Swiss-Prot record:
PROSITE patterns in UniProt: GTP_CYCLOHYDROL_1_1
Taxonomic classification: Bacteria, Bacillati, Bacillota, Clostridia, Eubacteriales
Enzyme class of the recorded protein, top EC level: hydrolase
Family assignment from sequence similarity: Belongs to the GTP cyclohydrolase I family.
Reaction catalysed by this enzyme: GTP + H2O = 7,8-dihydroneopterin 3'-triphosphate + formate + H(+)
Keywords in alphabetical order: GTP-binding, Hydrolase, Metal-binding, Nucleotide-binding, One-carbon metabolism, Zinc
Domain of life: Bacteria
Protein name (database record): GTP cyclohydrolase 1
Xref: InterPro entries: GTP-CH-I_C/QueF, GTP-CH-I_N, GTP_CycHdrlase_I, GTP_CycHdrlase_I_CS, GTP_CycHdrlase_I_dom
Pathway(s) served: Cofactor biosynthesis; 7,8-dihydroneopterin triphosphate biosynthesis; 7,8-dihydroneopterin triphosphate from GTP: step 1/1
Assembly: Homomer.
Length: 196
C-alpha cells in the first residue's frame, strides 16, 4: 500500500480551515505539503505487512552456530529507541525503549535487523501492545524460534498532553512467547538482563 500524499495535503488544508486559520497565509502555505511528507516518513511502516517486513529484514546466519538447549543461550538487546503514533488520537508515543530477546533455534538474525524491525513496526498507527506482538511475530518468522520476548516502555501524548495530562506517566508492556512465558528460569533471566 502506498501513502496517498496528495490526499493528505488536501485533508490537512481542510483541517487548517476547520481550525479557523487561513492555509494560504505565509506561515501555513506549505504546511499541508510538509505534513504530507512527514506522514510519508513517520508512517512508512503502514506500507508493509508483517510478512513483508520479515522478508525485508530476513538476514540470518547459520554456519558455525553452536546453540544448545541450555537456557543461557539467549540473544538479548535493549534500549532500542523508537517512536509511534497511537491509533486513537494520532498522538505521539515517545521516549519508547524496546527490549527484545529470543532463544535461537539454529539460526540468528543480524543485530541491526532487530532494531530495524522495531523501528519499522513503530512507524504505523499503533497500540503499544500491538507493537510488541508485531515484533514478536516478525522475529518468529525470521528465526523460526517460538521463544521470543518484547518489553516496551514509553510515554503517550494522549496521556501527557491532553485528557488527564499526567506528564511522566510511563506504560510498560510485555509480549512473552514460548519459554519466556512458560519457563520460570528463562523469564527470570530475561528480567535480570532487562533490569541490569
Amino acid at each position: 500500500m502506498a501513502i496517498d500524499v496528495k490526499a493528505i495535503e488536501e485533508h490537512i488544508k481542510g483541517i487548517l480551515i476547520a481550525l479557523g486559520d487561513n492555509p494560504e497565509r505565509e506561515g501555513l502555505k506549505d504546511t499541508p505539503k510538509r505534513v504530507a511528507k512527514m506522514y510519508e516518513e513517520v508512517f512508512k511502516g503502514m506500507c508493509y505487512t508483517n510478512d513483508e517486513i520479515a522478508e525485508m529484514f530476513n538476514v540470518t546466519f547459520e554456519e558455525d552456530l553452536c546453540v544448545s538447549d541450555n537456557v543461557g543461550d539467549m540473544v538479548f538487546m535493549k534500549d532500542i529507541e523508537i517512536f509511534s503514533h497511537c491509533e486513537h488520537h494520532l498522538a505521539l508515543m515517545y521516549n519508547m525503549k524496546v527490549a527484545i530477546a529470543y532463544i535461537p533455534k539454529g539460526k540468528i538474525i543480524g543485530l541491526s535487523k532487530i532494531a530495524r524491525i522495531a523501528d519499522m513496526v513503530g512507524r504505523r498507527l499503533q497500540l503499544q501492545e500491538r507493537i510488541g506482538s508485531d515484533i514478536a511475530e516478525i522475529l518468529k518468522m525470521i528465526t523460526d524460534s517460538e521463544d521470543v520476548a518484547v518489553i516496551i516502555e514509553g510515554e503517550h501524548g494522549c496521556m501527557t498532553t491532553r485528557g488527564i495530562k499526567k506528564t511522566g506517566a510511563k506504560t510498560i508492556t510485555t509480549t512473552l512467547r514460548g519459554k519466556f512465558n512458560t519457563d520460570t528460569i528463562v523469564s527470570n533471566k530475561l528480567m535480570m538482563l532487562y533490569t541490569k
